[in-house]
A protein has these predicted regions:
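Mature N-terminal segment immediately following signal peptide/propeptide cleavage
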Residues: 31-71
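M16/MPP (pitrilysin/insulinase) zinc-metallopeptidase core fold and M16-derived inactive scaffolds
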Residues: 67-132, 175, 195-199, 310-326, ...
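Short acidic/His-enriched helical or mixed secondary-structure segments at domain edges of catalytic enzymes
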Residues: 165-184, 262-281, 318-327, 372-425, ...
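An aromatic/glycine/proline-enriched structural segment found at the starts
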Residues: 20-30, 227-291, 452-495
Length: 502
C-alpha cells in the first residue's frame, strides 16, 4: 500500500512539473502580469465646506482611528525682514504653547489622557496642524483643535524655552560641514536677497515677542487659508458636519497671503569654496531647474534617475563609488519647483585630495548624458522604478487624503484634476531621444556653480595620480566664500598669523 501511494505521489509531481512553466535562469527573466491600478479620483473625496476650506474626506474603517491634517497658506516667506524665525516660532508654539483656556501643561495632559497626538509647524511655504486620535474621542479632539487654531496662548515660558533651544541650535551651525553647505546652497541657488536664503540670527530670534506670534497667527490662520485632509473611522456625512462646525464663526477675519516671491537670482557659474578644516570635502554641483508643470518633466525625471537619482543603478554612483571608490554615496536630484524653479544638484563627499577628481567624473557623466543616448536597458529600468512603485503613493487612506489635499493647496487640482491618472502613461511615452534632448537642454557642465566645503589647501592640491585642478573645471574664477559666524551670519575674520600686526 505504501509503495502504491509513493508511486501515485511521484506520478502527480511529474505531471505537475510538466504543466508548470520552467523557472528562468536569472531573476530578471521572471515575467509578471501587467500592473492594473487606477489612482483615486480626487473628485470622489473633495468637499467645499461652507465655512471656507476645501476638505478631502476619506473614510477608512479598518482601525478605530482618525487623522486630521490642516494645510495653512503661510510660511517663512512671510517673515518680516529682521524677524526671521517668526513663522517657525509661531508654528512651533501653536500647540506646545497652550490655549486661552488651558495652560501648555494642561493641554499636554489632556491629549495624553486621550492618547491623542497634536502637532503644528510652519515651513518655508506651508503651515501644518495635525491631530491623530481614537475615533470615539473625535468630538473632544476637534474641540481642542479649534482652541489651538483660534486661541493659542503662546505661553511665555514656552516661548523663552523655544528661544533658548533655537539659539543653541544656531550656535552649532558651523559644527558640521553639512549645515554650512545647506546654508550656502540657498544663497548660490536663489541669491542672497531671495527670501529662501534669509535665515534666523541671534538678533532676529531675540527680537521675537509674544505679540509678534499672536499677530502672525491672526493674519494667516483663517479657514479661507486652509486645505483639510481627513481619513479614518467615520461616516462621511457626519465628518463633513463636524468640519463645518470646526471652522464656523471664526473669531477673527484673517488675510489672504501675498503670492510667494519668485525673484530668484542664481549665482554666476564658477567654483565657490568655504574653507573648513575637515578631512572630507562636500561638493554640490548646481544648475537652474524647472517648474513642475514643465511638459518635459517626465523625461527630466527619468533622465535624472539614470544620471544620479537611481541609487546603485545610476551612472554617477557607479562611476564615483563603485568604479573609483571616491565616495560612500554620490548622486543627483532634479526636483520640480511648485512656485519657482528648483535647483538641479549633483553631490557627494570625498577625501580632500580626491575632491577635484570626483567632481570631474560627475561633470563627465553630465556631458555624456547630453552627447550620447542612454541604453534601452537604462531607460526601462528607470521607467519601472517609477511605474511599478507608483501605487505605494496611495497605499493608505491617510496618504490618499494627504496627497489630494496638497494637490489642492498647490493649485494642481484646479489645472489638472486627473494629473495622477495619466502620470504613468506620460512616463511610459518617454523615449531615448527625449532623454538626450532634455539633457542637452538642461545639463551644461560649462555653466555649473560648484560649491565646495572643506579644507581648501588640501583640496586645491589635488591628487598626484589624477592631475585635475578644481579651479580649472569651470572657465570662471574660484571664489572664496567666508565662513560665517553661526549666530550673526557675518563673515568670520581670519585670525592674524603669529608675529603679524593685529
Amino acid at each position: 500500500m505504501l509503495i502504491r501511494h509513493l508511486a501515485l505521489l511521484a506520478l502527480t509531481v511529474a505531471l505537475s512539473a510538466d504543466t508548470l512553466p520552467a523557472i528562468p535562469p536569472r531573476p530578471e527573466a521572471l515575467k509578471f502580469p501587467a500592473l492594473n491600478y487606477e489612482p483615486p479620483d480626487p473628485r470622489q473625496y473633495r468637499v467645499a465646506l461652507k465655512a471656507g476650506p476645501v476638505a478631502y474626506v476619506v473614510p477608512d474603517r479598518e482601525l478605530p482611528l482618525v487623522t486630521v491634517s490642516i494645510l495653512v497658506r503661510s510660511g517663512a516667506y512671510l517673515d518680516p525682514v529682521g524677524q526671521e524665525g517668526l513663522a517657525a516660532f509661531t508654528g512651533g508654539l501653536l500647540v506646545r504653547g497652550g490655549t486661552a483656556t488651558k495652560t501648555a501643561e494642561a493641554l499636554d495632559e489632556r491629549l495624553a489622557f486621550l492618547a491623542a497626538q497634536m502637532a503644528a509647524s510652519i515651513g518655508d511655504d506651508l503651515g501644518m496642524v495635525s491631530l491623530n486620535l481614537l475615533s470615539k474621542d473625535l468630538p473632544e479632539g476637534l474641540a481642542l483643535l479649534r482652541e489651538v487654531l483660534t486661541q493659542p496662548r503662546f505661553q511665555a515660558d514656552k516661548l523663552e524655552l523655544q528661544r533658548q533651544q533655537t539659539l543653541q541650535a544656531l550656535q552649532q551651525r558651523n559644527d558640521d560641514s553639512s549645515s554650512i553647505e545647506a546654508r550656502e546652497l540657498e544663497a548660490l541657488s536663489y541669491g542672497n536677497q531671495f527670501w529662501a536664503a534669509r535665515q534666523p540670527t541671534s538678533v532676529s530670534v531675540n527680537s521675537l515677542k509674544r505679540e509678534d506670534l499672536q499677530a502672525f497667527h491672526r493674519r494667516w490662520f483663517h479657514p479661507t487659508n486652509f486645505v483639510v485632509a481627513v481619513s479614518g473611522d467615520f461616516d462621511r456625512a457626519s465628518m463633513v458636519q463636524a468640519l463645518e462646525k470646526l471652522f464656523a464663526d471664526w473669531p477673527f477675519p484673517g488675510e489672504v497671503p501675498p503670492p510667494i516671491p519668485t525673484n530668484l537670482k542664481p549665482a554666476a557659474p564658477g567654483v565657490y569654496v568655504v574653507n573648513k578644516d575637515v578631512p572630507q570635502g562636500r561638493v554640490s554641483i548646481l544648475l537652474p531647474g524647472v517648474l513642475r508643470d514643465d511638459p518635459d518633466y517626465p523625461a527630466i525625471l527619468l533622465m535624472n534617475d539614470i544620471l544620479g537619482g537611481g541609487g546603485f543603478t545610476s551612472r554617477i554612483m557607479n562611476r564615483v563609488r563603485s568604479d573609483e571608490g571616491l565616495a560612500y554615496s554620490a548622486g543627483s536630484s532634479f526636483p520640480a519647483g511648485v512656485w519657482y524653479p528648483s535647483t538641479f544638484r549633483a553631490g557627494f563627499q570625498s577625501k580632500s585630495r580626491t575632491v577635484a577628481y570626483a567632481t570631474s567624473i560627475v561633470l563627465e557623466e553630465m556631458k555624456r548624458m547630453a552627447s550620447s543616448p542612454v541604453t534601452e536597458e537604462e531607460l526601462q529600468t528607470a521607467k519601472r522604478s517609477f511605474i511599478e512603485s507608483f501605487p505605494e503613493n496611495f497605499n493608505t487612506k491617510s496618504k490618499v487624503a494627504g496627497i489630494l489635499a496638497r494637490e489642492e493647496f498647490t493649485g494642481r487640482f484646479a489645472k489638472a484634476p486627473d494629473f495622477w491618472k495619466g502620470f504613468r502613461a506620460r512616463l511610459d511615452r518617454v523615449q531615448r531621444d527625449d532623454i538626450q534632448r532634455v539633457a542637452k537642454q538642461h545639463l551644461h557642465p560649462e555653466r555649473v556653480s560648484i560649491l565646495v566645503v572643506g579644507n581648501q589647501e588640501e583640496i586645491l592640491k589635488g591628487h598626484p595620480d589624477h592631475p585635475v585642478s578644481l579651479d580649472k573645471l569651470v572657465s570662471a574664477p574660484l571664489t572664496e566664500l567666508p565662513l560665517r559666524d553661526p549666530l550673526t551670519l557675518e563673515p568670520i575674520k581670519a585670525e592674524p598669523e603669529a608675529g603679524t600686526a593685529k
